[in-house]
Amino acid sequence: MRFSRVFCSGILLVAFMGCGVTAPAQVGESIRITFLDVGQGDAVLIRSPEGQTALVDAGWSSPVTSLRALDVDELDLLVATHPHADHIGGMVDVINSIPVHFYMDNGQTHTTATYEGLASTLQQRTDITYLIAEPRSISLGSVEIEVLPLLPVASTDFNNRSIGLVVRYGDFSAFLSGDSEVEELSSWVRRGVVPDVTVLKAPHHGSYNGFTSEFLADAEPEVVAISVGSNTYGHPHTEALEAYTYAAETVLRTDLDGQITIVGYEDGRYEVVLGEEVTAMEQGRSGGLGVVGMRYIYE
C-alpha cells in the first residue's frame, strides 16, 4: 500500500495521537468496550474515558449505523487483525463515512476482492497514517493498548497471524485477538505475554481450535465475549463453550445477547450492558450484582 506509513515507538505514537493534550481521566470515568452485533464476524469498539476511539475489525458488512448510534464521529485508530472478509468487509464504508487517523494491519495481503478493495481505498487516502503491527504500546488517552508479537507463519496462514491486543485501563483489562488459533495462542503463552484479564474476546468466534487450556489458565478471564452469528462452521463449538464456562464467570454471545458493552473502571470493577446502552444508570451502584433493565453490575 502506498498511503502514508509510520513505523514508530509507543512514545512517538502518543504524540501523534494527541494524547499529550487530552484531559486526564477523572475518578469514576470508564472505558467502554463494545462488541458490535455484526453476525458471523468481528467488530469491537474501544472508547477511552477521554472519548478517543479505536475500532478493531469491521465485520462482513458496514458497521457504520451501529457506530453512529454510539456517537462515533471519528476513529483515532482502525485495526484489521487479519485480511479475512468477516473482519475487513465493512472497512471501506467505515473509512469513507468516518474520519480515520491511524490504520494498522499485520502486513499480509490477500487475493480476494474484499481485500483488494480495501487496499485500493487506503492507497487513495494519504490522510490516514499506516502502522505496521509490531510489539508496541499505543496510548488511547488513559487507555494503553499493547500490540503482541506476531507469529512468523506461512503467508497464507491468516488466522495464526491475527493481531493480538491487550487493552488496559488501570486494573481493568481485555484481550482481543481476531481469529487466533492454537499455534498463535500457544506462542504467546510460551513468550509469557498473556496476562490475567477482565475480558476475553473468544478467538475465532468460539472455534474448537481457538483456545487452549494453558491460554485460558494464563488469561483467567472474568468475562468471555463470543462474536458470532449464523454459520455453517458450528461456531461456537461445544468444547469451546465448556472451556469458557469453566474458566470465566460470565460467557456472552452476540448471536444470543446482541450488542455487548463492557464498562470498565480503573479500580477493576466493570458492568455488562446488553443491547443499547442505558447511560442514565451510571450512578447509584451498590455492592454485589445489580440488575437494571439489561445492565449487569459487577463489583
Where are these regions (language model features)?
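Non-globular, low-confidence helical/coil segments that flank catalytic cores
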Residues: 2-5, 13-299
